[in-house]
C-alpha cells in the first residue's frame, strides 16, 4: 500500500509539474507577443484577400470597357492595346499566400497592377476626345463602375498597409522579435508608393488635336 501511494503521489507531482510548465510556456509566449502575432497575421491575410478581390473586380470590367471602346472606330489603338496587354499580364500572375512572404514576387505583382491602373487611367483621359464615346450610356456606366472600383482598391490597399505596418512593428520590436525569429514570423512586404504616381499618372492630352 505504501508503494502504491508513493507511485500515485509521484504521478500527481509529475502532472503538476507538466501543468505548471505548460502554463509557464503559455505565459512566456503571450508575453513575447505570440498571440498578437497570430491576430495580426490573420488580419493582414484578410486585408490582402480584400485587395485581391478588388483587383479582380477591376480586371473583370476591362473586357466590357474594351468592347465598348472598340465601337469608336477612330479610337487610339495604342491606348487600347496597352490596356489589353496590361490586363493579360496582371491576371496571368499566380498569387498564392506565399506571395505575402516573398518581397520579389509581391513587387512584381504590384508593378503589374500599377501598370493596369495606369493604362486604364490613360484610356479614360483619351476617351474625353471622343464625343460619341462620352455620350455612350454603356461606357458612362462602365466608367462609373471603374471609378468606384478604383476607390475600393485604394481603401483596401490602405487597410492592408496599416495591418502590415502593425505586424512588422511587432516583428521588429524587442522582445517580440525573439518570438518572430524562433517561430519563423518574417516581416511582410507592403506597397511601395514611391514610384506608383509615375506608373499610374495619366498623360497630358491636347484636346485641340483632331
Task: Report residues per predicted region.
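A helix-centric hydrophobic-segment signal that preferentially recognizes long
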Residues: 2-210
Amino acid at each position: 500500500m505504501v508503494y502504491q501511494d508513493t507511485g500515485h503521489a509521484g504521478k500527481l507531482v509529475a502532472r503538476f509539474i507538466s501543468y505548471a510548465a505548460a502554463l509557464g510556456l503559455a505565459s512566456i509566449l503571450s508575453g513575447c507577443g505570440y498571440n498578437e502575432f497570430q491576430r495580426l497575421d490573420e488580419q493582414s491575410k484578410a486585408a490582402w484577400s480584400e485587395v485581391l478581390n478588388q483587383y479582380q473586380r477591376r480586371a473583370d470590367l476591362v473586357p466590357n470597357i474594351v468592347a465598348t471602346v472598340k465601337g469608336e472606330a477612330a479610337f487610339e489603338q495604342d491606348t487600347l492595346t496597352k490596356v489589353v496587354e496590361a490586363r493579360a499580364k496582371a491576371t496571368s500572375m499566380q498569387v498564392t499566400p506565399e506571395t505575402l512572404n516573398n518581397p520579389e514576387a509581391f513587387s512584381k505583382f504590384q508593378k503589374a497592377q500599377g501598370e493596369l491602373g495606369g493604362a486604364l487611367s490613360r484610356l479614360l483621359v483619351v476617351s474625353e476626345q471622343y464625343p460619341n464615346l462620352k455620350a455612350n450610356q454603356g461606357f458612362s456606366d462602365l466608367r462609373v463602375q471603374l471609378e468606384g472600383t478604383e476607390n475600393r482598391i485604394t481603401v483596401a490597399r490602405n487597410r492592408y498597409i496599416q495591418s502590415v505596418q502593425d505586424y512588422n512593428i511587432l516583428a521588429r520590436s524587442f522582445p517580440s522579435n525573439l518570438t518572430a525569429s524562433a517561430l519563423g514570423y518574417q516581416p511582410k512586404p507592403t506597397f511601395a508608393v514611391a514610384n506608383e504616381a509615375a506608373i499610374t499618372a495619366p498623360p497630358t492630352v491636347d484636346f485641340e488635336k483632331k
